[in-house]
Amino acid sequence: MACVSYPYEAPVSQTLFERAAAVTPGGVNSPVRAFRAVGGTPRFMVSGNGPYLTDADGRTYVDLVCSWGPMILGHSHPEVIAAVQEAVARGTSFGTPGEGEVALAEEIVARVEPVEQVRLVSSGTEATMSAIRLARGFTRRAKVIKFAGCYHGHVDSLLAAAGSGLATFALPDTPGVTGAQAGDTIVLPYNDLDAVREAFRAHPGEIACVITEASPGNMGVVPPAPGFNQGLKDACAENGALYISDEVMTGFRTSKAGWYGVDGVRPDLMTFGKVMGGGFPAAAFGGRRDVMAHLAPAGPVYQAGTLSGNPVATAAGLAQLRLLDDAAYAKVDAVSAEIRTLVTDALTKEGVAHRLQNASNMFSVFFTDRPVNNYEDAKGQESFRFTAFFHSLLAQGVYLPPSSFESWFVSTAHDEQAVQRIADALPAAARAAAEATA
């Protein structure tokens, strides 16, 4: 790891981290939050307002994580908060159907044309796990194609060569996943259609589905090559498999219809999360009516959840989606473009080799002079420069994802003042990256 000095301490966060470590493995409830990839003390946040987070030590940061994507309207949006307060006042969970879940499902179906029916769940992991089970039940096949660097939640069969936290910690897979569980997963290089076609030739009549992030953000942002997603769809159609587009990250962030609204490739099944929950645990999977008809109680493929369609989560999600009109997306896209230009200009001025890649308003920086088209390319970056860059920005009150393998996110709340604060911090951060050593 790079030799990095931390310009200030975070004593309250450090105390909380030590308390957490005594009762929680690694002191966190999701590994990348632990700052292991960058070093230092994880910041324990106590509040968020608009584009800002405030930590337990009283320091305020411009937030470029946005809770890993969901907070596209910024923190504590008054209309979302009001919807949540009204829902909580009526009760927090009923264990029955409710109008809120119907309204949220209707909103998703109205926005995303390939989704004819949708099932609500509580996490992106549940959504992808359930979509895979449904694809297997529908096709009566077992094997699944996924791509190295694409992360689809912590599902046993999908953790092979996954991105996100596994990439952050340089883990090829994880203990606890048996050979039998992983044996039906075929892992291929991302953006390689020839490898996909060869896999179908090698396993005729065995592959249930191909699952891919619609535009990956869990190995850093690595967009699909032109024609790649359509090629996946075509290969699936030719071989009787289902094409599953994982839009947990891109869904309702990259456009009103997610990445489908960008590339127009029609999946058989799709998964959603993050933005659709408005900051609450909510996710969904949906797609073709004839496929969804195989789900219980309509069909034989079982899936269930005590808190699926939770009334508070659906109220938050519905409020957020209804606020995401064309003007909101134009705002997020414009802010993202402005920040991307600032980052590139600062790094270029200091002579730092880098590739800034984006998928709509999602983006990340790779510290390399080579194109990044797949997971192997992403792993070739000089991560020690990111560490120095990260800590310089953190010290100046700009909060990035604590990993070079994660997307950055912005919101409609990132105003001129927030952007200026980022602009003011970037020159020193770029110098820190330039001067960093492995």
UniProtKB/Swiss-Prot annotation:
Its cofactor is pyridoxal 5'-phosphate. Keywords: Cytoplasm, Isomerase, Porphyrin biosynthesis, Pyridoxal phosphate. GO terms for molecular function: glutamate-1-semialdehyde 2,1-aminomutase activity; pyridoxal phosphate binding; transaminase activity. It comes from the Bacteria. GO terms for cellular component: cytoplasm. Its EC number is 5.4.3.8. It catalyses: (S)-4-amino-5-oxopentanoate = 5-aminolevulinate. One of its GO terms (biological process) is protoporphyrinogen IX biosynthetic process. Homodimer. Belongs to the class-III pyridoxal-phosphate-dependent aminotransferase family. HemL subfamily. This is Glutamate-1-semialdehyde 2,1-aminomutase. It comes from Streptomyces avermitilis (strain ATCC 31267 / DSM 46492 / JCM 5070 / NBRC 14893 / NCIMB 12804 / NRRL 8165 / MA-4680). The gene is hemL.
